[in-house]
């Protein structure tokens, strides 16, 4: 049962002052309690965030908040194709190496993001028209990037945003040239590159159990798994509008029915960042056994891609919002 807002606020105040006494100065931590630690106490793997060299070296409060309050990191941009292989066969890992070193040094679980995506894709890839060429390019890219961090990345978003809103495959260079077989190629290559990593298919607008897009995801994943494609998890980005948190339970349960080992909330942000919405999403993951964790897509509002909607858990002064304390109280 989800506590009402009055209960959440009261409990949050009690825990805030208790946390100050037990966890050191709030100023150094930026929040009195780690929601990651409390989430893990319920048997989940992580409650995490994102980072890259630019944000880590910007406001010093960002790394302080990550170190103290979150247990997992995804790279916002540094592992995308345009960053790692801007020219064919010429790999650049400066940004992603920095990210991985920070995460490992601070004991954070790493999710790799992302290997095959139609966006932030160099033109030399998007202009390919030959099946053999594109297959070889995909295999080389996936293998090289994954082996760079073999044994260091818990899970990879192997393919990202491959569905249209009607549940059909998105038109992209990958689907145009290879059809849906690009999914098999990507996952089989990823499994070979790092057999221990969990392999995810990730998408947005999977926020209603009855939507055509979610149903398309489920039916395709069931089919691919039955055909032997090694898909371990489904990632729901969960970029929500205000008031949409209540649907998270139904959507995660529906995604879990596809037959993967895991599901995860991979890019969470919510317009207005209400306590109710955030607690609804946290409870949805707690209640679904296959949901291993939640990644919030940004630390503080100024760094959000949706900054004008104030969607994150820390405000413009990098102080925790009511939603952060409500999550801590609910846990």
UniProtKB/Swiss-Prot annotation:
Q: Does the keyword Repeat apply?
A: no
What does UniProt give as GO cellular component? extracellular region
User: What is its EC class?
Assistant: hydrolase
Quote the temperature dependence note.
Optimum temperature is 40 degrees Celsius.
Q: How does activity depend on pH?
A: Optimum pH is 5.0-6.0.
A GO term for molecular function: endo-1,4-beta-xylanase activity
Q: In which pathway does it act?
A: Glycan degradation; xylan degradation
Which EC number applies? 3.2.1.8
InterPro entries for this protein:
GH10, GH10_AS, GH10_dom, Glycoside_hydrolase_SF
Main subcellular location of this protein, as a coarse class: secreted
Q: Name one Pfam family in it.
A: Glyco_hydro_10
- The organism's superkingdom is given as Eukaryota
Residue ranges occupied by any GH10 domain in the UniProt entry = 50-330
Please list the residues that make up the active site.
161 (proton donor), 267 (nucleophile)
Q: Which UniProt keywords apply?
A: Carbohydrate metabolism, Disulfide bond, Glycosidase, Hydrolase, Polysaccharide degradation, Secreted, Signal, Xylan degradation
Signal peptide stretch: 1-23
Biological process GO annotation list? xylan catabolic process
Record Gene3D superfamilies:
Glycosidases
Q: Does the keyword Hydrolase apply?
A: yes
Q: Which cysteines are joined by disulfide bonds?
A: 285-291
Reaction catalyzed: Endohydrolysis of (1->4)-beta-D-xylosidic linkages in xylans
The protein's location, in the record's own words, is: Secreted
**What role is this protein assigned?**
Endo-1,4-beta-xylanase involved in the hydrolysis of xylan, a major structural heterogeneous polysaccharide found in plant biomass representing the second most abundant polysaccharide in the biosphere, after cellulose.
Entry's family note: Belongs to the glycosyl hydrolase 10 (cellulase F) family.
Name of the protein in its database record = Endo-1,4-beta-xylanase 1
Gene name for this UniProt entry: xyn1
